[in-house]
Amino acid sequence: MKKAIQFGAGNIGRGFIGAVLEKAGYHVVFADVNEQIVDRINRDKGYTVQIMDTVCEEVRITDISAVDSRNPELAQQIAEAEIVTTAVGLTILPRIAGAIATGIEARREQGVEQPLNVIACENGVRATSQLKAAVLTHLDAAGQTYCEQYVGFPDCSVDRIVPPVKSENPIDVVVERFFEWNVERAAFKGAVPEIPGMNPADNLIAYIERKLFTLNTGHAITAYLGRMKGYMTICQSISDEQIHAVVKAAMRESGRGLVARYGFDRDAHFAYIDKIIGRFTNPYLCDDVTRVGREPLRKLSAGDRLVKPVLTARQYGIGTPNLLLGIGAALHYDNPEDPQSVEMIAMTARLGAAAAVAEIAELPAGDPLPALAAQAYAEVERIIR
């Protein structure tokens, strides 16, 4: 029996990665700290993925079990697995690194020479590399040597909208039909597993940045502009003509940067942008703007979805007025229930928009972006409200 360990039994874990692995013939063990979800998976031994699109479909996922990720039993589960995946959020990766390291150590002690591949399926660049660095800190020299020989850590790019829709059954999940899972081919240990829906990629960074600069950029700007106008959901926000125009223009600006850097076909990429915007309008996937816009400090960092597209585009002399409006809107994201929003609003009030952006994105002195962002911060308030 092929076995996969999926850290994170949340909506993404169940509705995307876990479902893909189960359909590929793996017994999927969900590892999570949510005891209610763990108990429900073990009780029901299955859940339904509701694919909501112009044509709706229900898919049953049944070859599954679950374990509390703090349970020592997890180490043996990892010792018996061929693949470990995560969908827990970037900030949680260091917290699960110890459990993964313990599982790797169990494999070493048991003399397991079958390769294990660990893939962090998170919204971030090189998430698996970050996880690997954290895992290695929990291994001694012998464990690190074993890990380098038998454990692969391929980076990946994932794309599927899985909104937090409440169902009668708490482990059923709603998803869109579209998904992409691009995984770094060269980083696998052993043969690349044949998993329908997983694309082994030779130029992963291009796929990572295409997704980051398109879906993530557009999603975030839609959320921040929608919040400024009082909308509650992404589909409401993108249906506003003014927001739609800014978001599409911003995605085209980031797209021109991608075309210049990676040689994507311009027309094909612009068609991809239109497809992404079409996904935002899906009435079955009315994602909350507060969920999509959460953690604005992270989203405003130099390597993330708002600032990095601007930095990339300017390398090729491409103007980014609408991307800058997105940064300005992010600085207006005022959500008292989001600690990063509270910190950002206080920082902007204390330092001013330009200095706040410079500090958040850790930009060098003299970089022109903070001043441009400050202008956009004022302009977006004038034109959007």
Language-model-detected regions and their locations in the chain:
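Substrate/ligand-engaging "lid" and interaction regions
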Residues: 1-5, 11-385
